[in-house]
């Protein structure tokens, strides 16, 4: 499978992507990680309005292969939860970097994405040469 690595995305070591939009940060899981999980059967996400610290889990993705937690790559408040992914987990599988986003966060600080990988750095980590 060939994966997309949009230039405007940043990535955490734990395969979450971050997309900055109007001062808010949209978070999801990379196509690579979703492909490794196989068929997604259940998604659970933290509630809107919840404030979390960097490294805390904000959700769980259950597939036929495994149950994986998703981690917050920075501290902040959840301002929106993608209810569509909870109702239709296949959205996450079919379009993880589009309609399959998980939450939108208001970051605690401007430097939130400074520690994350660029698309090129992430691609070199997950795609064999």
Task: Set out the residue ranges of the language-model regions.
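Acidic, low-complexity mobile loops and tails
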Residues: 1-54, 90, 94-129
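Short, glycine/small-residue-enriched coil/turn segments at secondary-structure junctions
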Residues: 3-6, 70, 74
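Residue-level recognition of beta-strand microenvironments
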Residues: 18-20, 64, 81-84
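Conserved "cap/hinge" positions at secondary-structure junctions
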Residues: 56, 62, 82-83, 89, ...
């Amino acid at each position: 499978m060939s994966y997309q690595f949009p230039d405007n995305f940043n990535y955490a070591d734990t395969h979450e992507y971050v997309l900055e939009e109007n001062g808010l940060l949209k978070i999801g899981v990379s196509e690579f990680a979703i492909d490794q999980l196989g068929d997604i059967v259940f998604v659970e996400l933290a509630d809107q309005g919840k404030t979390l610290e960097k490294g805390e889990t904000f959700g769980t993705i259950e597939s036929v292969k495994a149950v994986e937690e998703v981690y917050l790559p920075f501290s902040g408040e959840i301002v929106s939860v993608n209810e569509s992914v909870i109702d239709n987990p296949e959205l996450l599988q079919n379009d993880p970097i589009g309609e399959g986003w998980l939450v939108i966060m208001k970051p605690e600080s401007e430097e939130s994405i400074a520690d994350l990988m660029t698309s090129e750095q992430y691609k070199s980590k997950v795609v064999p040469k």
